[in-house]
Amino acid sequence: GQVMMAQPLKSCLDAALADSAVPAPRRRVIYLSPQGQTFTQAKARQLKADYDQLVLVCGHYEGVDERFIEACVDEELSIGDFVLTGGELGAMVVTDCVCRMVPGVLSDTECYTGESHWAGRLEYPQYTRPETWEGRTVPEVLRGGNHAEITAWRTRQSLERTLVKRPDLFRETPPTPDEQRLLDKIRRDRSRPQLTEPPVCRPAAADDLPAILAIAQPARQYLRR
C-alpha cells in the first residue's frame, strides 16, 4: 500500500507553524493513529490546559513515513479500536472536544461541566415537555421546583447510571467518601426484592409457611448489613 512521504508532510507542518506566535512549549503536534493513546475527556482537558496550539496530522493509506513521526510528532492519539479511511474524522473529534472548552465557544461552562465523562461519571437523565408522553411521566422531583432535591436526584441518577452502565469509570476516578456512601445505598436499594404484581391480602394458611420462611431469610440477611 501507499505510504505518505516524510518531506511533503514536513513542509506542510512548517507552513502551518510559520506564522505562529505560540512558543514551542505551548504547541503540540499530534498524529491521529490507531497505535496512539486512546483519546478521552481527561486527555482533552489536559490538552486544553497545557497547550495553546494543536497541530493535528491526519494519516491516510497505509500511514506515514515513520521518520516523520520520529522527527516531528509529539504524540499519537487514537479515538478507538476500529479502522477509518483516514485520520480526518479523528481530528474532527479531537477538535470539537477540545475547542468546546475554550472560553466563548459555548455560552457557559455549565454547558459542558455537567455532561457525561466530564468528572468520570455518566450524566443524569434529561427530560422536557410534555409532562406525560405515551404513559411515561417526568419524575415528580423535577416538577416540584425544589432545587436541593433536584440536585440530590441528579447526583444519585448520575452515580446509578455509571454503576450500571460504566462501572469501569469508578476505577479511573474513584468515588469520593460522599459518593461511596450514596453508592452503598444504591446497591442496597437495587438488591431489595421488587414486586412484579400487586400484593394480595388474605389470612395466612399453614401451607404458606415455606413461602414466608423463604422471604424472611433474605430479609434477615439484609437487615444485618
Which residue ranges define each predicted feature?
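Conserved GNAT-fold acetyl-CoA-binding loop/helix
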Residues: 213-225
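SAM-dependent methyltransferases
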Residues: 130-198
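Internal, active-site/partner-interface "lid" segment
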Residues: 89, 101-141
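Residues within well-ordered alpha-helical secondary structure of globular protein domains
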Residues: 15, 156, 186, 215-218
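Conserved beta-strand scaffold positions in the cores of enzyme catalytic domains, especially
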Residues: 29-31, 76-78, 201
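Structured adenosyl-cofactor binding patch, chiefly the S-adenosyl-L-methionine
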Residues: 64, 68-115
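S-adenosyl-L-methionine/SAH cofactor-binding core of RNA-modifying enzymes
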Residues: 2-60, 66, 103
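A short beta-loop-alpha structural element at the N-terminal edge
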Residues: 200-214
